[in-house]
Design a protein with these regions (language model features):
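Short S/T/G/P-rich N-terminal loop/turn motif that feeds into the first structured element of a domain
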Residues: 10-207, 211-238
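Bacterial Sec-dependent N-terminal signal peptides
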Residues: 1-13
Length: 238
């Protein structure tokens, strides 16, 4: 608990993430219900907000920025549930048939490790395609992993790379330690093209720098996905 308190206080931004692991056979039904829920949220002007992302293996992420622990105790959907009556519960019963597992946890954005243009912290609005690189590590190697991540950032800057990325790390509700690097692009082709260009910019020395992370990683994952503005939500403002 003390470790989590420290991490949250040091983070640039914390996010509550709800993840639905949707069954392939239920993908279209899930999409239908998710759009109904989004429409209901707009109708009732639900007083919370989230960004939605989807991975290529049908994981859906609903990502809400939070400022502190107290926000986790809030019930922003209570008024909406009361107004909708049985329809609200029935909607979530339908959701539950679309996945065998789901859950909620916290991640933290780490601006100190992120590599972004001066004055920028978020991906461009027209870049919804994503590559997510997960690097897991044992707790005993936390210091070495962080130093490796800093070395990669410094290397990108020294080479003048324009392949920018944001870094997130695990938080409350997760069993494993990891860093997740999020790289945006306009689409899959744009991502591949920019990746090849970046390889040329960084040159063969990149492997010496990357090894400062790889030798401490217990495993690594690369996942493709996209942001879903059509399933994202924010309340109306006066």
């Amino acid at each position: 608990f003390l470790c989590f308190t420290f991490n949250l206080s040091q983070a640039q931004q914390a996010y509550q993430v709800h993840q639905d692991n949707v069954k392939p056979s239920m993908l279209m039904e899930y999409e239908k219900i998710a759009k109904e829920f989004n429409a209901a949220s707009i109708e009732h002007n639900l007083q919370t907000s989230w960004f939605t992302a989807m991975s290529n293996d049908f994981r859906y992420y609903y990502i809400t920025p939070i400022k502190n622990f107290a926000e986790l105790d809030e019930r922003p959907m209570a008024d909406m549930a009361k107004a909708m009556g049985d329809t609200f519960g029935e909607m979530f019963d339908r959701f539950d048939k679309c996945y065998d597992s789901h859950g909620t946890y916290i991640i933290m954005k780490d601006d100190a490790l992120s590599y972004m243009p001066e004055g920028k912290s978020d991906a461009p609005a027209d870049e919804n395609y994503r590559k997510w690189f997960y690097m897991y590590y044992a707790p005993e190697n936390a210091k070495n992993m962080r130093e490796g991540m800093m070395a990669v950032k410094a290397f990108f800057a020294a080479k003048g790379s324009t392949e920018y990325y944001r870094v997130y790390r695990n938080g409350f509700g997760q069993m494993e330690h990891y860093y997740m690097v999020s790289v945006s692009a306009k689409d899959e082709i744009d991502s591949a093209t920019r990746g090849k260009v970046n390889e040329q910019v960084l040159g063969p020395d990149r492997w010496d720098v990357f090894s400062k992370i790889m030798k401490y990683a217990t495993r690594m994952e690369e996942i493709s996905g996209e942001m879903r503005p059509d399933l994202s939500y924010s309340p109306k403002t006066e």
